């Protein structure tokens, strides 16, 4: 069993982008569902659905590509806060990825949100990952 579900999700998406796969199947947890919803809202993926197989449930992410050469919309994902070294930030010190072109996904007391939402609500939290 994987302990760091967010890192597993990020690695699966990164690997799928390299081989130009259209879908990715990852184990469903509350955290991965919320991160997937954010990726869908921000336009990095086209579809997110939950699939149950026996007693386990999985998330099926449909990745988004552009052009004939199938360039992925997700250029890179980077895990920031890890189980061995948690990284926290208040709302004033949330970093901007590529000058605002990418997003920061945070785990806050209000749930998992993007950097823009956290600044609007003036809440800080644990920086889960960068997406650009």
Curated annotation (Swiss-Prot):
Any single Gene Ontology cellular-component annotation: chloroplast
Subcellular location: Plastid, Chloroplast
GTP-binding keyword on record: no
A GO molecular function held by the record: rRNA binding
Main location: plastid
Pfam families, per the entry: Ribosomal_S8 (PF00410)
The keyword Transmembrane is assigned to this record: no
One GO term of the biological process aspect: translation
Record keywords: Chloroplast, Plastid, Ribonucleoprotein, Ribosomal protein, RNA-binding, rRNA-binding
Function of the molecule: One of the primary rRNA binding proteins, it binds directly to 16S rRNA central domain where it helps coordinate assembly of the platform of the 30S subunit.
Subunit organization: Part of the 30S ribosomal subunit.
Similarity comment: family membership: Belongs to the universal ribosomal protein uS8 family.
HAMAP family listed in its UniProt record: Ribosomal_uS8_B
Name of the protein this chain belongs to: Small ribosomal subunit protein uS8c
Organism: Angiopteris evecta
Gene: rps8
């Amino acid at each position: 069993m994987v302990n760091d579900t967010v890192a597993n999700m990020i690695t699966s998406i990164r690997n799928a982008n390299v081989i130009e796969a259209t879908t990715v199947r990852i184990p469903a947890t509350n955290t991965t569902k919320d991160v997937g919803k954010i990726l869908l809202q921000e336009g990095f993926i086209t579809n997110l659905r939950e699939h149950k197989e026996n007693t386990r449930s999985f998330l099926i992410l449909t990745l988004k590509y552009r052009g004939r050469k199938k360039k992925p919309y997700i250029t890179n994902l980077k895990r920031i806060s890890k189980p061995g070294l948690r990284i926290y930030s208040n709302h004033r010190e949330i970093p901007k990825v590529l000058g605002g072109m990418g997003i920061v996904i945070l785990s806050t007391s209000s749930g998992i949100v993007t950097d823009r939402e956290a600044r609007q609500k003036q809440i800080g939290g644990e920086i889960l990952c960068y997406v650009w």
